[in-house]
C-alpha cells in the first residue's frame, strides 16, 4: 500500500511493504535494509571514496573501527537518502549508526498508525520531541525527511545544540522542521522544555545506557575487542593491526553515554516526570538497551498510571534492540 500526502508543497510517498518484520530483520520500510550501495553513496558524497575498502566477501565496505570512515559513511547515507546538503558533527560526539536509528523512526510510525486507523500519519501535523537531540540530530533528520514530521530537539550540551542548529541552518529541507531548546536543569527531562501551549504527538529518546564512566569504558572496550576479532577474520592479507582504545569509533560525551543509575534509573525518572505532561504528549517512548530492565520499566509505567504500555522489538542482523512506549489515555 502506498500512502501519499502533501507535506509543505512536497509530495511524500510512504511505501508500506508487506515484507515480514522480525526481530532479526530491519523494518520493511527501512531503506538500509539491503545494505550499503557504496558506488551510489560515493557519487552522492565523494569524500567517502577514500574510506572504501574491499571486504573478504569481495564487496565494498569501510573499516568500521575507524571513526573518520564511519563518519564519512553516515554523511553519505544522510545526503544520499535523506536529502541533506551536508552533515557533520564535532569531534568526540556520538556518531550513531543510521540504519538502527531509522528503525526506531519506522517503529514509531507504525505505533502512530495504530491510533490513525492503520494509516501512518505524515506531514508536520505530527510533532515529535527528541530528548537529547545530540550534535547529530539523527532522529529529526530521518523523521522529517521520511514522513514530513516536525521536531523539537532538546539537549543540555551547548556544543550539541549549536551543531544541531548548524545542521538545520545548512539544510533547507530540515530547517523548517527542526527547532532546538536547551535543558538548563539536568535534574529534569521534560520540565523547562515542554511549554504550556505545546502538544507533541510523541517523544523519543536514546538514553545514556551506563551507570558510570567506568562502565561506559568497559562497554566500549568490549566493542573494540569485537571489532578486532571481526577485522582479523575479514582481513585479506593476514596483517590485521590490533584495534586500540585511541582508534575507538564509539565516541560520545559523558551525558550521551552514562548517568547516575544508568538507563533504568533514567527511564524510571522519565516515566515519573511524564505524568505531569500526559495531556501534552500522546506517546512517550524510549530506547532500552538491556532487556532485563523491561519488567521494572513496565512496572513503573503501570504504577504511575499508564493506561497503555508497549515494547517494540527491532533487529539489525545479530543485534536486537527495542523501544518502550506508554501513554496515559486509552
Swiss-Prot record:
GO terms for molecular function: 23S rRNA (adenine(1618)-N(6))-methyltransferase activity. InterPro entries: METTL16/RlmF, rRNA_lsu_MeTfrase_F, SAM-dependent_MTases_sf. Coiled coil: none annotated. GO terms for biological process: rRNA base methylation. GO terms for cellular component: cytoplasm. Keywords: Cytoplasm, Methyltransferase, rRNA processing, S-adenosyl-L-methionine, Transferase. This is Ribosomal RNA large subunit methyltransferase F. It comes from Pseudoalteromonas atlantica (strain T6c / ATCC BAA-1087). The lineage of its organism: Bacteria, Pseudomonadati, Pseudomonadota, Gammaproteobacteria, Alteromonadales.
Amino acid at each position: 500500500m502506498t500512502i501519499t500526502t502533501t507535506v509543505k508543497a512536497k509530495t511524500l510517498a510512504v511505501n508500506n511493504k508487506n515484507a515480514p518484520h522480525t526481530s532479526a530483520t530491519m523494518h520493511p520500510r527501512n531503506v538500509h535494509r539491503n545494505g550499503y550501495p557504496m558506488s551510489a553513496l560515493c557519487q552522492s558524497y565523494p569524500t567517502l571514496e577514500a574510506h572504501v575498502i574491499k571486504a573478504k566477501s569481495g564487496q565494498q565496505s569501510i573499516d568500521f573501527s575507524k571513526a573518520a570512515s564511519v563518519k564519512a559513511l553516515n554523511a553519505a547515507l544522510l545526503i544520499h537518502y535523506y536529502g541533506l546538503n551536508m552533515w557533520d558533527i564535532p569531534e568526540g560526539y556520538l556518531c550513531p549508526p543510521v540504519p538502527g536509528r531509522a528503525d526506531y523512526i519506522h517503529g514509531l510510525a507504525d505505533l502512530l498508525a495504530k491510533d490513525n486507523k492503520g494509516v501512518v500519519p505524515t506531514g508536520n501535523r505530527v510533532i515529535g520531541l527528541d530528548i537529547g537531540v545530540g550534535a547529530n540530530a539523527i532522529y529529526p533528520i530521518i523523521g522529517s525527511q521520511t514522513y514530513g514530521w516536525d521536531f523539537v530537539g532538546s539537549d543540555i550540551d551547548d556544543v550539541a545544540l549549536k551543531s544541531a542548529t548548524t545542521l538545520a541552518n545548512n539544510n533547507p529541507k530540515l530547517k523548517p522542521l527542526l527547532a532546538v531548546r536547551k535543558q538548563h536543569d539536568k535534574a529534569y527531562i521534560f520540565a523547562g522544555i515542554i511549554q504550556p501551549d505545546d502538544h507533541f504527538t510523541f517523544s523519543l529518546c536514546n538514553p545514556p545506557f551506563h551507570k558510570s564512566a567506568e562502565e561506559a569504558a568497559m562497554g566500549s572496550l568490549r566493542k573494540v575487542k569485537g571489532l578486532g576479532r571481526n577485522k582479523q577474520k575479514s582481513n585479506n592479507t593476514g596483517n590485521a593491526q590490533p584495534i586500540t582504545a585511541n582508534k575507538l569509533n564509539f565516541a560520545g560525551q559523558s551525558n550521551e553515554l552514562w548517568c547516575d543509575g544508568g538507563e533504568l534509573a533514567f527511564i524510571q525518572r522519565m516515566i515519573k516526570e511524564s505524568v505531569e505532561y500526559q495531556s501534552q504528549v500522546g506517546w512517550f517512548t524510549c530506547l532500552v538497551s538491556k532487556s532485563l530492565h523491561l519488567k521494572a520499566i513496565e512496572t513503573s509505567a503501570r504504577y504511575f498510571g499508564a493506561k497503555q504500555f508497549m515494547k517494540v522489538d527491532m533487529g539489525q542482523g545479530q543485534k536486537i534492540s527495542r523501544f518502550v512506549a506508554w501513554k496515559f489515555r486509552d
